């Protein structure tokens, strides 16, 4: 295992073991690594916007995919799509950033299934970027701050409509 992948693996393991999310512990580490890489390709850090790592897109996705209210079809598409992607492109994690981006762009041009998979990951990445931090993304309101968003009031005190 390359040093870089080892670091990613240990980071993802820390995410899993620091939570009480049962489904996350059932997601293979390679699936998490691929999802993390794809999110970082879709949401790169720019001079004005945070990248997927900064707004914690993977943590948001894992936290929310594990909740009972998460759409089952979306969960299936994300997890099975990632499994299929790994099966078709097992070398993905060994590619450099440019090659990874080119591969993602190529598959969404040639496969409706891949396009819907990437689209769904993008959808939840946008949610992670702009949702209230209580849901696990938008770490320290980083995305809100990057667009000078005025925070809505009242902010949620608990997640998913739980009673206070």
Feature map (PLM): residue ranges:
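Immediate post-signal-peptide N-terminus of mature secreted/exported proteins
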Residues: 22-55
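N-terminal export signals
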Residues: 4-24
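Short amphipathic alpha-helical segments enriched in leucine
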Residues: 11, 39-43, 66
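Mature-region segments of soluble proteins
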Residues: 37, 49, 56-164
């Amino acid at each position: 295992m390359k040093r870089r992948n080892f670091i990613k693996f240990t980071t993802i393991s820390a995410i899993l073991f620091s939570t009480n999310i049962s489904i996350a512990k059932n997601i293979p580490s390679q699936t998490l690594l691929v999802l993390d890489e794809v999110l970082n390709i879709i949401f790169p850090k720019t001079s004005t916007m945070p990248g997927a790592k900064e707004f914690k897109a993977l943590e948001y996705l894992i936290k929310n995919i594990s909740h009972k209210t998460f759409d089952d079809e979306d969960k299936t598409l994300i997890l099975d799509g990632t499994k299929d992607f790994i099966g078709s492109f097992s070398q993905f994690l060994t590619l450099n950033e440019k090659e990874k981006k080119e591969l993602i762009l190529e598959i969404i041009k040639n496969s409706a299934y891949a396009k819907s998979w990437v689209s769904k990951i993008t959808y939840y990445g946008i949610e992670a970027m702009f949702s209230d931090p209580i849901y696990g993304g938008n770490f320290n309101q980083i995305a809100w701050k990057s667009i000078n968003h005025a925070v809505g009031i009242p902010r949620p005190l608990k997640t998913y409509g739980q009673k206070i």
